[in-house]
């Protein structure tokens, strides 16, 4: 197929070793996997050199922005185009832009104990409605019960996060959404109380007034609104993790011309280049620093005498999706939410089994034989034992529950 594009990423849980894996994004074949105790440059270089020896030099490399990883790539493959994942890039930009104010907002909301108060009030309302919850006609016919039902619905709405996209922070700012719902709910309760004078509305007004009166919360939320708007502009320029998109962590970005995206990002940079805000200037500095690693022209390769164009992926989502798939399997097998012990005990080469679902890989592996049994029978047992001992040397003693 003219070569391979190397995607690199790692996964761990707690203080487990990092399962560091390389995959060809064109074929989807996992090329290699090792365990390392950190993502320092000197730990990653042997992994990359091994891939270079086995598979040659890749057409391009896609990874996250880890300093050690980028340094190792530069040392082993200095002439290869090294690209960073747009999702990781945006996530880092967003955290730098929003994190401090977002933490302040979250802490002030926590200290206000508004969530506890609202949940307690919701429980009171539910008990008041009791069995009548199933008979809406009886509730709506009683003004006080109807007001209780409405107030309860407003509380549930304040806590609702279904409008979020599923990307996590900084793409989803659930605490800022909650704050705005509280303020909106407060205004709605005041209007309803003025119209009806019903007690449940007044009870919510008393709870929510502390949030509306908190000027520091209002100031912090205002700063977040401003910077979230700027962050969303950059998301739109890069055409990935767009607000309102429901793909969540499976979002690999829209199929767009790279030059068009680069031009829009350039316009974004020029728009905020003159800002006096230190957060904005740091954001612009980051974009300029990684500019060459963000936008790649299609790569021309020759296959069967014909020139074809290969466009590297904009994200390393295929690696992220694989790791989520692996952790789901480990949770299902071990029966534990945490996969730390299973990752620690697992031989790094285990992930290569996933390749057996790839028809192209299976054809290469079988090499004309009728099946895996016949193919494995051709392998010298001494070679197998040598390779197996190498893999075992990377592992601690497996815990009992990991042997299931």
Residue map of PLM features:
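Amphipathic alpha-helical/coiled-coil segments positioned at domain termini
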Residues: 82, 303-388
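Amphipathic alpha-helical
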Residues: 255-337
